[in-house]
Amino acid sequence: MELDQLSVVIVTFRSEDKINSCLGSIPTNIPVILVENSNNVDFKKKIENQYPNVECILTGENNGYAVANNIGLGKVKTKYALVLNPDAIIKKDTIENFLKITDQYNDFWLIGPVNNQANKDIIDRPETFEVNDLKGFAIFFNLVKFKGSYFDENFFFIF
């Protein structure tokens, strides 16, 4: 899979102190849709000026994680989307690893990485395996497989 088939969606709510590290870790040739759950026009201008690959959408109010992600995913024009938390940092090989998996398993719906444990030990699982749930900090969507909404908007989640 080529990078032009991937977009990143990030939901924020007053995350100015965290978002720069996240955005700085994303390759600049990947489009990013940042959905800010507020009406902070200054934040939007600053982000879009600093990161030309980022489109910042202001919701006007805090609609929650599910609604905001659905707004962002609805704007994606690529086949795949990576939903990412604003405090997540993409390591150098993360995108490439996702792309390798899409080449191997082109019939997938969702893919998620194994994250660091609370004690900061890194879990290295180079093989793929099925799980019952995914951690929400980074979810890789095959948008071709989804029909309808992505997140259940009855759940506000954390934001």
Residue ranges and their predicted role:
Residues 12-28:
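Short, well-formed alpha-helical segments that are part of the catalytic scaffolds
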Residues 25, 36-45:
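A conserved acidic beta->alpha catalytic loop
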Residues 30-39, 57-59:
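Short beta-strand/loop segment that forms part of the nucleotide-sugar
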Residues 59-76:
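Glycine-rich, basic loop-to-helix element that forms the pyrophosphate-binding segment
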Residues 81:
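Short aromatic/hydrophobic "clamp" motif used to bind/position activated sugar donors
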Residues 88-124:
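Conserved donor NDP-sugar-binding/catalytic core segment of glycosyltransferases
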Residues 138-148:
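Conserved nucleotide-sugar donor-binding
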Residues 148-159:
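Donor nucleotide-sugar recognition loop
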